[in-house]
Swiss-Prot record:
One of its GO terms (molecular function) is identical protein binding. It is found in: Endoplasmic reticulum membrane. The chain crosses the membrane at residues 588-608, 621-641. This is Transmembrane and coiled-coil domains protein 1. Residues 224-310, 457-566 form a coiled coil. Residues 156-166 have a biased composition (Low complexity). Keywords: Acetylation, Coiled coil, Endoplasmic reticulum, Membrane, Phosphoprotein, Transmembrane, Transmembrane helix, Transport. The modification Phosphoserine is found at S378, S410. Residues 113-125 have a biased composition (Basic residues). One of its GO terms (biological process) is endosomal transport. Residues 1-587, 642-649 are cytoplasmic. Residues 64-75, 197-214, 420-433 have a biased composition (Polar residues). Its main location: endoplasmic reticulum. The lineage of its organism: Eukaryota, Metazoa, Chordata, Craniata, Vertebrata.
């Protein structure tokens, strides 16, 4: 993953960036802790390198002397002791994972002979040239092997190679350094050949699997950075969701307000309100669309971060590696001086084969078969190694080349001696371990036995690496299935959310269309009512106009009649007196008739109540008869009453 892709997550500006600052602060603290741990590991490696430097300088001097001198050095130790060597050995004793074997080595090597500091590799070559028949490893090929093996190792291997260094010291302790004589030398050569084969096979295997290591360095996610990035993205997704909800609520409010205003507005105001509403609606729709696109972008980023994670920044990794290689190279200069000078005999041929195999990991893996066939004379088990190396070359050759170019161009040294000190720890350990005992000559039989045993160890290492690779593939497949399940679940959830959002959008569109249709219907009804009212008012005005015209016609007729009557009256002025008398007579007759009618009505009003029932009728008739009787005999009755009421005489 490119650094721009890992840093892009933190380049987005956040308005409320307090949480982001806190995360950045925690990230810097974690990086400082990692740098401290790396520095401590580098110091431990430097201590181990210093101890190995003095150790292998002493063993190199011992391998250059005769067995008689070895016995004399062991029997007659010098009283002077190098304090630096003792301190380094004491520190190695505290750091190494095998203190008992190292204590045996330190007890055997108590009085190292003094060496002149400052003697370069070229001067030593001049002093001790190899025999004519023994091939030596070219310095360039040794550097290429170191670069290839270094490319197969993780970038953090310079800070975590304490077990490798301890294994090298264990090999040195198991080699029987203090055994004098020819037999001890042959035994040391055999053991060192076996251990060198194992170490070289592990180096070749690591270079074969260089793609896995480089990918693990480039692809190992930093948990703290990944966690912070996921939290940051989730916070942004929540903010965008809230903004989308707010925008949708504002759009609904605008629709409700438009409907409310459209109901209580006339035509001109309704058109103006409609224009304003359409502008606001388009703007809110664009805003919601942009927020949804941004939300999908952050969801995609979150999926990528959850799947791939955020690795360490390559700048920091290469800076730490460069510093670590500088320190280790400066401390293990003497350790690397003995690599090229002391590799002789049968081990030199195997080192050349190892170099060819390591170079073939990147370019030509089939050369391994021909080289090992020429060197060892047997090609029974070569296809297994060739297949494993071909797989590493086909899958990850380009990545191994990239790492080789990085590590070859990273350390910058002023001389060839400094450059040789920055090679890989495993190759240097193997070559130096081989250089401890190659000083003495060995027979062809021992060489063939050692080569066959070394080849068996190499095949055993290749088999173990294959098993490890199979386990890694199983773990990778399990992890891949887990991430595929998570990815499918997230995609299903995303599809459901997208489907739900689409349904909501469709419902909202339907509701908006319904409101618009209702508004259009209301407008049509208002227009029809307006037309109806206008028609009714026109009809009423026409009726009123017709009535007024009829009244005017009648008035004009009455005026004409009055005029005609006036004309007639003017013509009948001669008979006016007769007409006046006739009128007065008629008036008198009418008055008499009115009096009679009043009398009759009065009598009727008086008689009618007396005639309503049968009893009243009989009573009324009796009363009338009585009155008539009194009226008829009134004189007699009056005299009788007068006599009755007169006083006596």
């Amino acid at each position: 993953m490119e650094p721009s892709g890992s840093e892009q997550l933190y380049e987005d500006p956040d308005p409320g960036g307090k949480s982001q600052d806190a995360e950045a602060r925690r990230q810097t603290e974690s990086e400082q802790k990692l740098s401290k741990m790396t520095h401590n590991a580098l110091e431990n490696i430097n201590v181990i390198g210093q101890g190995l430097k003095h150790l292998f300088q002493h063993q190199r001097r011992r391998s250059s002397v005769s067995p008689h001198d070895v016995q004399q050095i062991q029997t007659d130790p010098e009283p002077e002791v190098d304090l630096d060597s003792q301190n380094a050995c004491a520190e190695i004793d505290g750091v190494s994972t095998h203190p008992t074997a190292l204590n045996r080595v330190l007890q055997q090597i108590r009085v190292p002979p003094k060496m002149k500091r400052g003697t370069s590799l070229h001067s030593r070559r001049g002093k001790s040239e190899a025999p004519k028949g023994s091939p030596q490893i070219n310095r360039k090929s040794g550097q290429e092997v170191a670069a290839v093996i270094q490319s197969g190792r993780p970038r953090s291997s310079s800070t975590t190679d304490a077990p490798t260094s301890s294994s090298v010291m264990e090999i040195a302790c198991a080699a029987g350094v203090c055994v004098p004589g020819e037999e001890a030398t042959a035994e040391r050569i055999e053991r060192l050949e076996v251990s060198s084969l194992a170490q070289t096979s592990s180096a070749v295997a690591s270079s074969t699997d260089g793609s896995i290591h480089t990918e693990s360095v480039d692809g190992i996610p930093d948990p703290q950075r990944t966690k912070a990035a996921i939290a940051h993205l989730q916070q942004k997704i929540l903010k965008l969701t809230e903004q989308i909800k707010i925008a949708q609520t504002a759009r609904d409010d605008n629709v409700a307000e438009y409907l409310k205003l459209a109901n209580s507005a006339d035509k001109q105001q309704a058109a103006r309100i409609k224009q304003v509403f359409e502008k606001k609606n388009q703007k809110s729709a664009q805003t919601i669309l942009q927020l949804q696109k941004k939300l999908e972008h952050y969801h995609r980023k979150l999926r990528e971060v959850e799947q791939n994670g955020i690795p360490r920044q390559p700048k920091d990794v290469f800076r730490d590696m460069h510093q670590g290689l500088k320190d280790v190279g400066a401390k293990v200069t003497g350790f690397s001086e003995g690599v090229v000078d002391s590799v002789k005999g049968g081990f030199s041929s195997f080192s050349q084969a190892t170099h060819s195999a390591a170079g073939a990991v990147v370019s030509k893996p089939r050369e391994i078969a021909s080289l090992i066939r020429n060197k060892f004379g047997s090609a029974d088990n070569i296809p297994n190694l060739k297949d494993s190396l071909e797989e590493g070359q086909v899958d990850d050759g380009g990545k191994a080349l990239g790492v080789i170019s990085n590590f070859q161009s990273s350390p910058k040294y002023g001389s060839e001696e400094d450059c040789s000190s920055a090679t890989s720890g495993s190759v240097g350990a193997n070559s130096t371990t081989g250089g401890i005992a190659v000083g003495a000559s060995s027979s062809k039989t021992n060489t063939l036995d050692m080569q066959s045993s070394g080849f068996d160890a190499l095949l055993h290492e290749v088999q173990e690496i294959r098993e490890t690779q199979a386990r890694l593939e199983d773990s990778f497949e399990t992890l891949k299935e887990h991430y595929q399940r998570d990815y499918s679940l997230i995609m299903q959830t995303l599809q459901e959310e997208r489907y739900r959002c689409e349904r909501l959008e469709e419902q909202l569109n339907d509701l908006t269309e319904l409101h618009q249709n209702e508004i259009l219907n209301l407008k049509q009804e208002l227009a029809s009512m307006e037309e109806k009212i206008a028609y009714q008012s026109y009809e009423r005005a026409r009726d009123i106009q017709e009535a007024l015209e009829a009244c005017q016609t009648r008035i004009s007729k009455m005026e004409l009649q009055q005029q005609q009557q006036q004309v007639v009256q003017l013509e009948g002025l001669e008979n006016a007196t007769a007409r006046n008398l006739l009128g007065k007579l008629i008036n008198i007759l009418l008055a008499v008739m009115a009096v009679l009618l009043v009398f009759v009505s009065t009598v009727a009003n008086c008689v009618v109540p007396l005639m309503k029932t049968r009893n009243r009728t009989f009573s009324t008739l009796f009363l009338v008869a009585f009155i008539a009787f009194l009226w008829k005999h009134w004189d007699a009755l009056f005299s009788y009453v007068d006599r009755l009421f007169s006083p006596p005489r």
